[in-house]
Amino acid sequence: MDVHPPRQPIHTVKDFLLHLLTITVGLFIALSLEAAVESLHHRHLVRDARQNLHREIAANYQQYAMNAKWVAENRDQLARNIELLRELRHGKKLDPANLGWHWQWNSFSGVAWRAARDNGAVSYMAPDLIASYSWIYLQQDYINSTALAIVGEESKAGAALEAAADPSNLSPLEIQTLLVKSAEINLSLSTLQSTMKGLEDMYIEQSQNRAAETP
């Protein structure tokens, strides 16, 4: 922003005041335009970030339904494992194919939220909006890490059966260890389901708020 000297010499106080007024008005207009352009840029930044966040949250909500289905199916399998292991403990022969310790999990995405923080869009959002997005993504991250930890534990749980090749080759101690581990994993999944229900409520609230904003 440049301020140029007067083209004509200033001879009177009136000329000086007029020139000062011209400079002041010019600076005010320039600063106002600059602020308006910057404000418009910030609004566009927030608008684009929110659109990306809503798309990502909607996609995560769809993935949530699949993850919830897999967790429920895995708990059913664990319940069967526990019953079969109890029968095995009492000497009943089992088909190895009926026992299993494995399940699927697809982590929720947080790319749009990280991008909004990195490009500064979050800093121009309203505080309640920031809090809403923050809680969703914090909950997602916690659930992702918890689920992946359970996946790791469950993957190791069936190692004894894998080594034995046949359930009848398992020792009483190995059977008891498998029983306890299966029960522990099932309890962990029960807690995970409760936490996931809280995330689902957040997704629903976010969707309702978005619908209310749409004209």
PLM features: what roles do these ranges have?
Residues 1-14, 35-215:
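Long, hydrophobic alpha-helical segments that serve as membrane-spanning/inserting helices
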Residues 21-28, 32, 36:
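Residues within alpha-helical transmembrane segments of multi-pass membrane proteins, especially transporters
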